[in-house]
Amino acid sequence: MYSTSVNNFQYNNYSTVGTVRKTSVSNPADNKISPQSTVANKTLCAFTGSQNAIQVRTELASHEEKTKYKELLNVCPKDTKKQLNQLLKSGILLNSNSNDKSTTLDNLYKMVKTPRAQGLSNIDILAQTVNALADPHDITQQFGNIPDQYKVQTAKLNQGKAGEENVEHSGTCVASSIEFNLAQKYPAEFARFAQGLSSPEMSVNKTIKLANLADNTLDAVWLLNAFEVPYKANNFNNVELTFAPDKNAIVRAHIQTIDKDKLERSSVDVLMQSTFMQIGSQQSYDTLTDKRTGKFNQNDKGLIEFEKTFTESVVEDKNKISVTYQTVDENAKLVGYETDFATMKKQITDAINMGENVIIGYTQVNSDNTIINGHEITITGIKKSPDGKLIFVCNDTDDNMSKPVEYTEDYLLPKIHHAGLPQAVVGDEVKLVENWVEGLRTYKELKKKTA
């Protein structure tokens, strides 16, 4: 679902569709408070996912589990062995909060014992998956370079659009934020995705509740059809979706398997982010160029707010609401806010206290309050500073740092354009419009602009 105040624009397009509230606003660019980065900490934290009814197990119980664990230790690199031990001690390895109730261990074992897609390595997929689970802050959206021996091949695949395959600035911040959240909060499901997407089928199935997309079953089906996600209806309540990366993802994934540099995406990052971009872009994404088409977005990079929340909802099988906080006019000028900062702070804090991460979209403005840039990051925690104000602990997949970063409330709150929140957090504070209504409205607006 979406708030009625949604302004669906792509951050580097900045067209809005909706009335503008005339509210005065101070320039966030004048805020001199700088963000603070936390000290890098590579020790694994205990699993902090949404696990109210999930038993945390830290000991191998059955002969089968012991055998699988031993066989993984026999084949994985030295660093991965240490990380596997950490995953076991923290409860992540035996976590079974996945769509089919398989454990993280089950899926890691399958990565090693069954074939991978052509061009991928069993051990690399295992090592990269374990690393992401051990420290999700290592997940990045940074594209790697194309080695000389692959430049001719990738140029041909690019069908004559010379140079577009040399991606310098990635538009996968939404996808990588969703990937980070999946790894940190749902480790068994993350491993299940990594296993399926790297298999010869290069896909993963997921059963979701239609009620998490719309109150009415037919409206939920409309959304699935609009986003062109392959599905099979089991009944009037549930539907089985098939997620897959685009056809060129395997090229990037193979290159990152054999030529990954520091701070570049792993093969698993490539497959995950391509898949989430495919979901949000109506199956129109091209990993080779990092561009997309699709019916809801006039821009060829990234995902807009509506697409982002649909992707979050189906990946997590949760009713996520996109709440828009900033009011932006047709000239991409920040002219006000849809609510006060106290309400904004309360909603985000309530979500964090529920055990949820909050993916936010923030903007940067110039001296005239015109938006010049936008980005998606994830709020993972909250602390208090000595003066009593809040500090937001965040993850940014585009900052070239494998560690969290901290922002004061005075710095971050004025910059937040929207946030993906659980419906329970928002309650009656925001008047809601169903996903399918917002999608249809967005589609009609774009049709008018292109007519």
Model-flagged regions — what are they?
Residues 55, 59-97, 101-297, 352, ...:
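Active-site nucleophile-adjacent alpha helix/oxyanion-hole segment immediately C-terminal to the catalytic cysteine
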Residues 301, 306:
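Solvent-exposed helix/loop surface patches that form functional interfaces
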Residues 34, 43-44, 49, 61:
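Low-complexity, small/polar and acidic-rich linker and loop segments
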Residues 6-31, 39-45, 54, 308-451:
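Active-site signature of cysteine proteases
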